[in-house]
């Protein structure tokens, strides 16, 4: 600053423009504007010399000096780094702003003659910027301290839950993850092959490349208060919210109508966020009615952040203390490995261990070591306790170690009592019917090869309830009981994932031995009497062709008067013999007509077919071919409902067809089947054993 003033000595540029707000001068004949000194003596103007020494340039405090010593002392130079070489991004904006405002106000107080004479506009605008900065949630100093004391803004107390060493470690991990994201984005295998990038696969692959796994926390939107849901997401009523975390660091939150959709939306936002300049901060977030500290990833340079409420309970993030190396010990580490509870919701041992660790909120880790004979040894650690080890290749050793670890954990599992969890599939029984129905009146309704579907259809057909009750046996084995109307039909023992299918199969076999079975053959083969598109369109053509020209027709009378007696037209009768058939014209058909619109079937033709079927006494169903479009099938559904018929579509895609039939009671269908043996595509099979 002294150098600039020294350079500007002796230079006079005349009067400088004023940056203060000035009122316009009143015109002649008008009264002057009222001022703050009305009724008082206005202050006298101080006499001053017109010519005096004035700085040629306005003093700008961020001009750097040229010497190395001054550059080192410059508080606005490069930011200092810690011992590990990583920048403390979290402290950079606040420290920089405090030094900046402090020097600015010191210039105002120390060099007031230059500020007042030249209208130092930068310092005049400074309080506005200060308010803008501290409106984002940081405590703002009072105006008195800005003008008089010039004290910097008070810093918040350091976090006791997350020490600086932990934040620096998480910052290093996020920088490593960001580099991995950019590396995968430049990989053509990740972006080519499809128009849309699979962000979930990319984020999972990048996080696993950093030797860890992502964490997804789901919550139904019904359980979240409406005030905590973003305004643009309030249209969702039955959706889900998904929070993505990694190493206890919050990344993003996604909202969608399903769990997979919310996860995909959250991972997409996370990948886009990791492509920017980001940092790890400790902020206060809300979880239901509790406010606690949390580690979050936010963009550098953004002063205000609006984070959605946390979906993970804050008690899962509590630091209980520090170990010998100074690292924090979290609540999950306080659990002993013997309290581990196995949840059998996977097929292999690795999946069971990972899912169980997530359920118990414990940490499981696999460590590899190459042996002298060029084989790999994999050891499984649960809560830093070695459970088992396996040998082989890097892949087979992990599976072998997981199998051995699972056997060790199964031995330590306590003997649980029968843990029951039921799934009830109830039929459409009438309300208020509390009478228990007899199993002897049950009719097995077989509409699928899956025994679970057969049992559910049977329960709905007979208006009964079916339940599947699980009982935990030893190890990974479970017992499943099938209960129909409070009566046990069958049971099976096996793995939880397949024991339900086995128990349902045994129940169907047991019921077929004593109860009649109605088999629906509609899905088992092609239907013979299928109504095609041409058959529907041919009805209009046949009716138009059958129309007879009457004697009082004007055209007929004109031809008779000209000598036509019948037969072909023309002198020798070589013309047409039959009248021109009526051609239907929809709306304004003509040049440029879409061919597909011409091939559409008429609604009155469909209604005529269904009306004739409803008035007849036929017991077979109407089956429309797969040539019909979605709109045409929609019309058939509406017309069938109009005449009190039931309609249902079967198949997928181009193989989808529609069946229209009568609403039958179970008793009427059984009576017809007993008399005729087969009604339409229904077939009756009597019990195999008495």
From Swiss-Prot:
Every G-patch domain range: 551-596
GO CC terms of this entry: nucleolus
MF (Gene Ontology): ATPase activator activity; DNA binding
Entry keyword annotation includes Ribosomal protein: no
Function description: Enhances the ATPase activity of DHX15 by acting like a brace that tethers mobile sections of DHX15 together, stabilizing a functional conformation with high RNA affinity of DHX15. Involved in the constitutive silencing of the interferon beta promoter, independently of the virus-induced signals, and in the inhibition of the basal and cytokine-induced iNOS promoter activity. Also involved in the regulation of IL-8 transcription.
PANTHER family found in the cross-reference section: NF-KAPPA-B-REPRESSING FACTOR, NF-KAPPA-B-REPRESSING FACTOR-RELATED
Protein name listed in UniProt: NF-kappa-B-repressing factor
Lineage: Eukaryota, Metazoa, Chordata, Craniata, Vertebrata
């Amino acid at each position: 600053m002294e150098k600039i003033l020294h350079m500007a000595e002796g230079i006079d540029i005349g009067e400088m423009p004023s940056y203060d707000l000035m009122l316009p001068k009143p015109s002649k004949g008008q009264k002057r504007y009222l001022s703050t000194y009305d009724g008082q003596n206005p202050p006298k103007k101080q006499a001053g010399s017109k010519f005096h020494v004035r700085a040629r340039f306005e003093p700008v405090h961020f001009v750097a000096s040229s010497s190395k010593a001054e550059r080192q002392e410059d508080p606005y130079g490069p930011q200092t780094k810690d011992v590990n070489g990583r920048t403390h991004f979290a402290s950079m904006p606040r420290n920089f702003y405090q030094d900046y405002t402090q020097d600015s106000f010191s210039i105002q107080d120390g060099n007031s003659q230059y500020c007042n004479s030249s209208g130092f506009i930068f310092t005049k605008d400074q309080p506005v910027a200060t308010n803008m900065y501290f409106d984002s949630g940081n405590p703002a100093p009072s105006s008195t301290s800005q003008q008089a004391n010039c004290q910097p803004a008070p810093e918040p107390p350091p976090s006791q839950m997350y020490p600086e060493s932990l934040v620096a470690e998480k910052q290093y991990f996020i920088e490593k993850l960001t580099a991995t994201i950019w590396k995968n984005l430049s990989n053509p295998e990740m972006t080519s092959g499809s128009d849309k990038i699979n962000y979930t696969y990319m984020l999972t692959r990048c996080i696993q490349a950093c030797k860890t796994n992502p964490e997804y926390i789901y919550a139904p939107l019904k359980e979240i208060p409406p005030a905590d849901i973003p305004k643009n997401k309030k249209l969702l009523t039955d959706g889900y919210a998904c929070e993505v975390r990694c190493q206890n660091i919050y990344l993003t939150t996604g909202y969608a109508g399903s769990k997979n959709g919310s996860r995909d939306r959250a991972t997409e936002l996370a990948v886009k966020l990791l492509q920017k300049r980001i940092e790890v901060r400790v902020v206060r977030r809300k979880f239901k009615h509790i406010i606690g500290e949390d580690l979050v990833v936010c963009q550098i340079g953004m002063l205000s952040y609006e984070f959605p409420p946390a979906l993970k309970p804050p008690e899962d993030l509590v630091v209980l203390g520090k170990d010998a190396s100074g690292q924090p010990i979290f609540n999950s580490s306080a659990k002993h490995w013997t309290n581990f509870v196995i949840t059998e919701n996977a097929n292999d041992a690795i999946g069971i261990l990972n899912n169980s660790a997530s359920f118990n909120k414990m940490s499981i880790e696999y460590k590899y070591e190459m042996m002298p004979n060029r084989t790999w040894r994999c050891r499984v650690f649960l809560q830093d306790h070695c459970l088992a080890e396996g040998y082989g290749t890097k892949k087979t050793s992990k599976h072998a170690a997981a199998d051995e670890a699972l056997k060790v954990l199964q031995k330590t599992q306590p003997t649980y009592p029968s843990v029951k969890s039921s799934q009830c599939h109830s039929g459409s029984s009438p309300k208020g019917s509390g009478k228990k129905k007899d199993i002897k009146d049950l009719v097995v309704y077989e509409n699928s090869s899956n025994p679970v579907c057969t049992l559910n259809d049977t329960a709905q057909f007979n208006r009964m309830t079916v339940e599947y009750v699980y009982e935990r046996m030893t190890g990974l084995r479970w017992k499943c009981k099938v209960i129909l109307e409070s009566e046990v039909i069958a049971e099976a023992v096996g793995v939880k994932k397949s024991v339900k299918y086995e128990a349902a199969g045994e129940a169907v076999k047991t019921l077929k031995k004593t109860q009649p079975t109605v088999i629906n053959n509609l899905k088992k083969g092609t239907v013979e009497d299928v109504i095609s598109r041409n058959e529907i369109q041919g009805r209009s053509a046949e009716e138009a062709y059958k129309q007879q020209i009457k004697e009082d027709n004007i055209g007929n009378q004109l031809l008779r008067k000209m000598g036509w007696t019948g037969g072909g037209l023309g002198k020798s009768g070589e013309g047409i013999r039959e009248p021109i058939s009526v051609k239907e014209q929809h709306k304004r058909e003509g040049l440029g007509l879409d061919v597909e619109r011409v091939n559409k079937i008429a609604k009155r033709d469909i209604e005529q077919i269904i009306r004739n079927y409803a008035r007849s006494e036929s017991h077979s169903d109407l089956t429309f071919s797969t040539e019909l479009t979605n709109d045409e099938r929609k019309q058939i559904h509406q017309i069938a409902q109009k005449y009190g018929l039931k309609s249902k579509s079967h198949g997928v895609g181009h193989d989808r067809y529609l069946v229209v039939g009568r609403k039958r009671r179970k008793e009427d269908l059984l009576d017809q089947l007993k008399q005729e043996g087969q009604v339409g595509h229904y077939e009756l099979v009597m019990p195999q054993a008495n």
